[in-house]
């Protein structure tokens, strides 16, 4: 009779799905209201003018316009704004 010794168990073999975080629309790009600008965990980027903040800290455009990234304030925070075109 052919025999094969039992293989040992392993504790590996798991991994979580990637969450596809990051900047989705870059500076200078034209966007429509509702477009997602940044997906993030926490406020790595802050909401500037014409930008909303979702409950999962997603930044989205509130108006049509052009994306602008800037640093402001005493803490030099990064803000994402949408400048509307008149």
Curated annotation (Swiss-Prot):
PANTHER family: LARGE RIBOSOMAL SUBUNIT PROTEIN BL27M (PTHR15893:SF0), RIBOSOMAL PROTEIN L27 (PTHR15893). It comes from Alkalilimnicola ehrlichii (strain ATCC BAA-1101 / DSM 17681 / MLHE-1). It comes from the Bacteria. Residues 1-23 are annotated as: Disordered. SUPFAM superfamilies: Ribosomal L27 protein-like. One of its GO terms (biological process) is translation. This is Large ribosomal subunit protein bL27. The gene is rpmA. It holds the Pfam family Ribosomal_L27. The keyword Ribonucleoprotein applies.
